[in-house]
Amino acid sequence: MASRPELVGRLLETLLKLASSGETLSVEELAKSALLSKDQVEKILEILGIPSKKVRLSEDLRLEVVLRGLELGVDGSLIARYLSWKEFEKLVARVLGKAGYGSIWNLRISSREGRVQVDVLAYRGDLMLLIDCKRWNKPPAPSEEAKIVEEQERRLRILKSLLEGISESGEGSRAVYLVPVVLSLYQPSKPLMKGHVFSSIGSFKSALDYIERAFFQLRHEKLRVKRGISLDKLVLRLRARL
């Protein structure tokens, strides 16, 4: 019973609200504020990986419990108001790092088509993920999602052109696949739109697994880069170019 998403969400929201000042909280205080029994609170704290004797959230633990709650199905709207944009970025970076991806953030790119900003460019093996992070106050309408796809298409074209220009492709080249992803706290209305992946942060690990298995069925751009150049080096060249 205590592990139901709505109960986990109720306690997590209370915890984020009361622990924002860094104070130590008791199980009794949390139970009273969240309208839960002491046993329920202790069980949920155990699920979230929080010691129940003295409840205090460091920044690192705060991000871990938010991620754990989202993975358990907690509604993102319950906790969105308690997360800064910086904390959302750190959540994304944590998931990417655990999955073995390198990443660079907040790339501002100029081209003949104009300027675009790339929130996250993540890379591992022969995959590069063009990630657009959205911190909506509510789930987006389908029309908003369609507009986001258009914006991602533009970023995709510009980034592909730029990467090919610095990759020294030609004889002895290899393929790298650039895949667009849209990420937010909320579950999207659809996980795919015109081949573009939409994912909540709580489902992001599963989305990464899916992308790695089926990227060739998704919207992607195939790049040719010099064989022997790692994506780390390619990203360094991109940084230098920008």
Predicted regions, residues:
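Intrinsically disordered, low-complexity Ser/Thr/Pro/Gly-rich regulatory segments
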Residues: 1-118, 122-242
